[in-house]
């Protein structure tokens, strides 16, 4: 198994921001460290109460420190609307091993999905092919149940625009010619802006696949919304790869398990990776559920299940 240490500067920066001691000693920890946090706009972004922001997250480094601190406390991090993402790495490679947890599940991502509330995150993996310990090689999507379906838009993109005043919706436009907005929900989340404070430009574009939404108003009057689940292959999703009969009615932290063998290249062919070093999760649907706001993948943590074995 290939091993590596994280760049010293990055680790020291994380230590300074989190107030916790960080070591560059390789430990084979089953849990991950955050390398990048670029959410789409959303109701929990910049939010001081349930979102846990402090108002000082005005640089990418501070945003990473925020996300890492949350995950160390086993607390969720929101990826915002469609396309928002987080990148993590381990202090060791994760093997594509058939002896992983319960028949070959190599890692897990913890979310808080329950029956009727899935906000699926598309998962990607990367090998540190050039050996520089940075996530700058090729990403491979882990195919899920919706991969290859006609209703899945594989090459999707959305540009988000910074609001020009406080308390405004965040406008967006996609590459299909559709315009929309992330609704400002003042009665629930009244921070001045849902546009990430550490994004320095007045607009930014996110890219990736987009799943067909399964969000609908079950009540017919806007009072009860359902975010339907997908069969398997997505973070923060109530699929069969939870490997649990627990319905998670309390919306607690719950793992979804993944196999590296599901990685595909840009042509949709098996990538046949022997190991991975980095994982990225990206909100996979562009939808909103009335007063509940935008669909946004939430993640609590990432675990090497070859080591952890479901514990």
Predicted features along the sequence, with ranges:
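A domain-level signal for the mature, folded cores of soluble proteins
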Residues: 20-119, 143-311
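Short beta-strand segments
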Residues: 121, 138-140
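Positively charged n-region of N-terminal signal peptides that target proteins for export
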Residues: 1-4, 17
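Predominantly extracellular/luminal cell-surface or secreted proteins
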Residues: 124-128
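C-terminal motif of bacterial Sec signal peptides marking the signal peptidase cleavage site
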Residues: 13-15
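Acidic, glycine-anchored loop motifs typical of Ca2+
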Residues: 102, 129-138, 241
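Sec-dependent signal peptide hydrophobic core
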Residues: 5-9
